Amino acid sequence: MRYSPLIDQLIESLRCLPGVGPRSAQRMAFHLLQRDRDGGRRLATAIREAMDQVGHCRQCRVLTEEPVCGLCASDRRDRSLLCVVEGPADVFALEQATDFRGLYFVLMGRLSPLDGVGPEALGLDRLEARLAEGEVQEVILATSPTVEGEATSHYIAELAHQRGVRTTRIAHGVPMGGELEYVDSGTLSHAFAGRRDYD
């Protein structure tokens, strides 16, 4: 059913969010219009301001309102450690879950030749230039354990090795609290092969 042009536009606009289909977008639109107009206005203002003011850090490419993010600007970070991630959300996840004190480089994706995503689309030339500066002593690869993520990690490892930079990969395996019988065979095989001494 078609509603008024403005309601249709709102519903269609909400569908740009990941995981939001037509029914969810319709429910959200009606909720904002019927029950939370102030919340809708705050949401609209927050979206507008974020879209206008948030960009990418010119050093690590994480989302920030400043030319250089707080992580890169901090003198408390270990500049010899560089963790390479696929997206800005990965930086926030690692910052919340780990005590990593190094810096980051955000790829904004992963290599995917079938989709036309090559090294230049990921800014790997910028990463290579950063490695050439000589400050980075270890690159920590924190890409997804997918075919594309592994290919991306392999490509970056080659760049790092050419510069004599140590390269490590985050461990993948059985999640905390997970039952072995429910873990897929690829994950289980990878976890078993990557076993370490028990202290």
Curated annotation (Swiss-Prot):
Record's protein name: Recombination protein RecR
Keyword ATP-binding: no
GO terms classed as biological process: DNA recombination; DNA repair
Domain Toprim: from-to ranges: 80-175
Superkingdom classification of source: Bacteria
Keyword Repressor tagged: no
PANTHER family: RECOMBINATION PROTEIN RECR
Keywords: DNA damage, DNA recombination, DNA repair, Metal-binding, Zinc, Zinc-finger
Stated role: May play a role in DNA repair. It seems to be involved in an RecBC-independent recombinational process of DNA repair. It may act with RecF and RecO.
Zinc finger C4-type: from-to: 57-72
Family that this chain belongs to: Belongs to the RecR family.
GO molecular function: DNA binding; zinc ion binding
The gene coding this protein: recR
Pfam families: RecR_C (PF21175), RecR_HhH (PF21176), RecR_ZnF (PF02132), Toprim_4 (PF13662)
